Amino acid sequence: MKKNIFTALIISTTAFILVSCGGQDEIYKEWIKEGGYDYPAKAINMTSLQGYQKVTLMWEKPMDPAVKRAILYWDNYAKSRDVNYDDFADGKVTIVVDSLEDRSYTFDVVNFDADENKSLPAELTVSPYGDSWLISRSERTVVSAIMDGDDAKIEMTKATDEMVATRFRYKDATGAWVDFKTLLKPGTNEITLPGALKGKRFEYSSAFCPSYGRDTVWRPWTISNDGISYKINASRWNVTVTTNQVFSENTPDKIIDGKVASASRWHSSRSDGLKNIFPKILSIDTGASPGEEFAFTKFVFYEHPSIVSMRYIKNYVMFVGSSPYDPNADDYANTFGIPFLSGIMSTANPTSEVVASTGATGRYIAIVFPNSWSSDGYIDLWELEPYGYIPSQAD
């Protein structure tokens, strides 16, 4: 009896297994091909070049004549492009994929033969560069732009990472725009714009290319903050100075007469009771009408041309504004507003240039001397040359 039961169980189990296996065969039958699949040759030696919003993909054309075409997939197979190998006679396939974003893409190449058998995919991940990358590149800025005769001398900040060149365009003497052909290279920061129109703003744009990239990309044009400065004729300006700070005929109006001469300079008081009084303040009225005020970008101070010990200017503070400055103000630091320029001058040279990164606009100027290199408290200014432009006429 036990033997019959055992035999029956074996027969039932065997039948169940046979039925189950038969069901599994039906499930996987569509994925199984008698004799196995034929896989055409896979794409080999797949490489890339990264460009601006694009990549260039390259691989070897299959040597198997049965392989006639391929499909290039990217974006997780959401996008594709057909590749006909007959279009590439030299044995090298080159495909450019553009309109890409700043991110990584995985590209797959699948080959097909005449019977539509497909190869295993050849895969390559590439990261093009685009607008996000370009925005992160820093543009140069203008250090100074000043007329030198009929030309403009432009000084820029140094080149930044991945910068390959900077181009310029400007207005000439006729008011026409000039696209200057000479490029400013990364190793230099000065350029001359021939025949530039003084007082006008100019434009510049730099090109960038990463070390791994093949495309050079130009940033949009940047308009200079200031116009091209020039030496201003200040002969009609009015200059006053702190009361009693004049020696003999050396009056303050002579610092803007265009002459660098001993008989044409301002010298502060030499009187024992007055010479060490500070601050000594020059107050200047340019007389400019509203809307025609200058934006000042540079001043050149002339002191004694030959005797070092007679160059007295030490610290200076300059202000530019729309209201007159009191030359007798004791509390200038709290009443004159924000200083435009300040610093300390050396006695090494007879001239000292004071340059602003951005021009300051106003009718009135104050130059404050809070001290002197001289123990006697002297200030001896032979000439003051102002440079600037009129903002309302700069475009």
Question: Model-predicted segments: where are they?
Answer:
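Trp- and acidic/polar-enriched beta-sheet ligand-binding modules for extracellular glycan
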Residues: 277-278, 307-395
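A short beta-strand element within beta-rich, extracytoplasmic domains
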Residues: 293-307, 367
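Pro/Thr/Ser/Gly-rich low-complexity, intrinsically disordered linker/stalk tracts
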Residues: 22-65, 120-161, 217-237, 387-392
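Disordered, acidic Ser/Thr/Pro-rich linker "stalks" and the adjacent N-terminal cap
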Residues: 222-287, 308-310, 392-395
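Beta-strand-rich modules
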Residues: 95-124, 192-225
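Solvent-exposed loop/turn segments flanking beta-strands in beta-repeat/beta-sandwich domains
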Residues: 55-56, 61-79, 155-180, 310-315
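Recognizes extended acidic, P/S/T-rich segments that occur
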Residues: 69-103, 114, 169-199, 339-345
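C-terminal motif of bacterial Sec signal peptides marking the signal peptidase cleavage site
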Residues: 17-20
